[in-house]
């Protein structure tokens, strides 16, 4: 399945780049300032988030032997903190640069992974599990809101919908990739450490911590909201729809060679 997926993905890129007259995802969009770095940061952050959620639940149910009902109660903070995090992210947007809001979202998932990875096998819920769950509530909303703003400001009018949709899709890809890679880490550690289930879970969580740290570093170094010096809203459709913000060029001017 992995090989088939890679082949299909490669075929999609070839079609979009060489044959599609009106491509769904113009490859030139990835040449817009900060856009490619943003994509990687978002994917890795959602990977780390999914790892923290999956293995927190795994820890509670398999190590501490919680029932499904107890686990549901343990995750009840999401009902309160989740909506609050959306409001807080919206409040921060006009006051703090989007890349720093994203950094906050990455930072909380770093802490959440560490808190769960370092828990004793048996411990009161309030000591580490509760703060890890509360902190992780902020991550997806902060990252999603900030990424949508940065993506929309990185491309021109015509491709803002495409860029925004891609950010939403990365949530699903990140979750799947995160759990997949972390599961591999967990199984390999258990295999070579005498079947130690808890050690495997800790290793998976530290893997989530590591990729979140990389995402945070990339956010600090390369993710910015591109500056747009245009005044007003240009009326000429060919310019408005093709301009890639921050490059000073139209989309057709930065397309791949075969499209020039």
Positions of the model-derived regions?
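C-terminal membrane-cytosol helix-exit motif in multi-pass small-molecule transporters
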Residues: 5-19, 215-223
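12-transmembrane solute porter fold
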Residues: 22-192, 196-215, 219-222, 226-227
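Intrinsically disordered, low-complexity terminal tails of fungal membrane proteins
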Residues: 225-260
């Amino acid at each position: 399945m992995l090989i088939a997926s890679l082949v299909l993905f490669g075929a999609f890129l070839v079609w979009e780049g060489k044959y599609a007259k009106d491509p769904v995802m113009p490859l030139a969009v990835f040449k817009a300032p900060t856009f490619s770095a943003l994509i990687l940061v978002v994917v890795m952050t959602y990977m780390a988030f999914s790892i923290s959620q999956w293995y927190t639940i795994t820890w509670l149910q398999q190590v501490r032997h919680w029932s499904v009902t107890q686990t549901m109660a343990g995750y009840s903070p999401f009902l309160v903190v989740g909506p609050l995090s959306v409001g807080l992210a919206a409040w921060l947007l006009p006051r703090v640069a989007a890349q720093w809001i994203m950094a906050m979202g990455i930072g909380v998932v770093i802490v959440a992974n560490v808190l769960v990875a370092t828990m004793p096998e048996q411990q009161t819920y309030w000591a580490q599990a509760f703060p890890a769950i509360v902190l992780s509530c902020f991550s997806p909303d902060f990252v999603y809101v900030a990424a949508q703003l940065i993506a929309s400001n990185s491309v021109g009018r015509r491709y803002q919908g495409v860029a925004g949709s891609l950010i939403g899709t990365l949530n699903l890809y990140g979750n799947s990739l995160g759990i997949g890679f972390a599961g591999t880490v967990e199984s390999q550690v258990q295999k070579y450490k005498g079947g130690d289930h808890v050690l495997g879970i800790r290793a998976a969580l530290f893997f989530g911590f590591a990729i979140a740290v990389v995402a945070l570093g990339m956010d600090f170094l390369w993710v910015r909201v591109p500056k747009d010096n245009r005044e007003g809203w240009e009326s000429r459709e060919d310019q408005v729809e093709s301009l890639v913000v921050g490059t000073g060029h139209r989309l057709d001017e930065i397309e791949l060679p075969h499209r020039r």
